[in-house]
Amino acid sequence: MDILQLAPTHLLAILLSSTSALFLITYLLRAGHRPSDLPNGPPTVPLFGNELQVPKSDAHFQFSRWAKEYGGFFTLKRYNNTTIVISDQKLIKTLLDKKSNIYSHRPASLVSHLITQSDHLLVMQYGERWRMLRKTIHQYFMEPRCERDHWKVQEAEAKQMLHDYLTMPEDHMLHPKRYSNSITNSLVFGIRTKTVHDEYMKKLFYLMDKWSLVQELGATPPVDSFALLRYVPQWMLGNWRNRAVEVGDLMQSLYQTVLDQVKERRQRGIQRDSFMDRVLDTLKQTPLSENELRFLGGVLMEGGSDTSSSLILTIIQAMTKYPEVQAKAHAQIDSIIGHNRSPAWSDWSKLPYINMIIKESHRWRPVSPLGVPHAVAEDDHIDGKLIPQGSSIVLNVWGMHHDSDRWQEPEHFQPERFADFPALASGYAGSERRDHLGYGAGRRICPGIHLAERNLIIGIAKLLWAFEFLEPLGSDSDISAHSGASKGFLHCPKDYGCVIRLRSPEKRETIMREFAEAQEVFARFD
């Protein structure tokens, strides 16, 4: 048949079909391809790019191997999406700090939206709304406020933590969780976590375990890179949507329950100087939706509870494996503090070795080995290589913290590495000479950094003043970074055995007395 004899509608159909086929073929040929103007990286395959090479768990180990081969920044192609992995700490200053106006965004994420409806500060897109919520948090947790007020709650909760270790050593994996969670909930909601059996605490850490697994890089099918996967039956792809919705439901339920408790207390005429009370007092000036209120409190509950407790558990485990470090800490504490009182926040500058131990724990076992991905808002260039607009920017925190060119024998726990870093972590954030990346970088740096540093210093100083931590006879706890920690985008040591030995009878009396004195602070939250 002569094509000229076809009806115009048939000709149009053929033309559209041919154009669509050509477009699809071109897309498939280009998808997964790494253009030459992008940073180098591992070889790609058509369509998939590097998707099949990215591990579904613990990707930071593979990223660190690739960094040795391809340099401090390299490109991964995931279908048509571009991911830039940074393993050179100098680039953190160059990009995320100096160009924070374009490197503070987040990659689009359907999973994050399903969980939070995009109202969670951690995954919220950078913009006016994000800046407003961030400012709200900063005003309550800025350093002067921590120095003036919050340390009293922190010291009281640390005194209970000593009492808990002394009287319930069998729950040693839970005491740091109660400590950090109670500080956070007291300051954010005016609600204490009185025991390790608290229902809010149990639900939060269960939720965090679930969310950590869902949010880990590589754990979810690339539904943002290859949208057609959204229409594949999810049972063929690990039930990714159901997993996300489950986490979202857990968040909504817990955060709404706590928020409702604050509102009910206020309706009874009981006001407290908590973060959420202040937010509710200013709703007319700063209107927030119910979902924004839920997640504003929730993000603080998460960040304030999980990171500090994970690091305290890491440090205690390190003490059992590195007794010479523990002995040195004991000696310094004993030279400053006697038996009649435990260390206080006011002692921190006299206990530099405690500060070194905390910095080394951030380096040795970072809680978030790959951080939370950033996204670049416009085209940028590094050393003549293009960083395309919309690229995901992954900070290989693990690789930078375990770079043998900077850290000799990086797998060893050696606090002396930080002898020349006497200030708190906030003093080095954004500087050329950074101690670690445990709190993130750029404008997305943890807004609770000042509170978290004090949680750790007060808690660890008191614990090492009071106790010696030992491995049980005949046991060998697993401190391997590959097998000794939980999976997900947040890492915490797996349960380990520990013998907790009181360092002197006099300290028992001090612990009991200080716990009784702490009740005066706790009474504010009854």
Curated annotation (Swiss-Prot):
This is Cytochrome P450 monooxygenase patI. CDD domains: CYP64-like. The chain crosses the membrane at residues 7-29. Induction: Expression is correlated with the production of patulin. Expression is positively regulated by the secondary metabolism regulator laeA. Expression is strongly decreased with increased sucrose concentrations. This decrease is lost in the presence of malic acid. Expression is increased with pH changes from 2.5 to 3.5 in the presence of a limiting concentration of sucrose, 50 mM. Natural phenols present in apple fruits such as chlorogenic acid or the flavonoid epicatechin modulate patulin biosynthesis. It is found in: Endoplasmic reticulum membrane. Disruption phenotype: Completely abolishes the production of patulin and shows significant slower colony expansion. Glycans are attached at N81. It catalyses: 3-hydroxybenzyl alcohol + reduced [NADPH--hemoprotein reductase] + O2 = gentisyl alcohol + oxidized [NADPH--hemoprotein reductase] + H2O + H(+). Heme binds at C446. It holds the Pfam family p450. One of its GO terms (biological process) is patulin biosynthetic process. Residues 1-6 are cytoplasmic. Pathway: Mycotoxin biosynthesis; patulin biosynthesis. Keywords: Endoplasmic reticulum, Glycoprotein, Iron, Membrane, Metal-binding, Monooxygenase, Oxidoreductase, Transmembrane, Transmembrane helix. Belongs to the cytochrome P450 family. InterPro entries: Cyt_P450 (IPR001128), Cyt_P450_E_grp-I (IPR002401), Cyt_P450_sf (IPR036396), Cytochrome_P450_fung (IPR050364).
